[in-house]
């Protein structure tokens, strides 16, 4: 997935989230950021680790997937496009993006 495709996908995620069309989803990422850098960017890992929680997952860690977290990820990507995020999967309630 190139930079332009990922940019479009993030815009779609933010739009759907703000329109309240995504009730639950997973966003799995492979990133060059280490755990502490990602915590500073997105927030601390969700300690409950419940399958019912929305989440942004890196390795074993589940991060808050609130509106603010998604906006932060989007803003950081646009602000520093040299960070190469790879979307491994995004699942919405209507499977609008398939794995």
Curated annotation (Swiss-Prot):
Q: Where does the UniProt annotation place the signal sequence?
A: none
Domain of life of the source? Viruses
CDD domains recorded for this chain? AcrID1
Name of the protein this chain belongs to: Uncharacterized protein ORF99
Q: Source taxonomy lineage?
A: Viruses, Adnaviria, Zilligvirae, Taleaviricota, Tokiviricetes
């Amino acid at each position: 997935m190139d930079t332009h495709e990922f940019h479009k996908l993030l815009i779609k995620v933010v739009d759907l989230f703000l329109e309240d069309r995504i009730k639950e989803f997973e966003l799995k990422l492979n990133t060059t950021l280490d755990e502490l850098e990602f915590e500073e960017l997105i927030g601390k890992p969700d300690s409950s680790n419940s399958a019912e929680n929305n989440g942004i997952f890196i390795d074993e860690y589940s991060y808050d997937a609130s509106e603010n977290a998604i906006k932060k990820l989007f803003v950081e990507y646009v602000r520093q496009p040299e960070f190469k995020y790879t979307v491994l999967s995004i699942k919405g309630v209507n499977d609008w993006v398939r794995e």
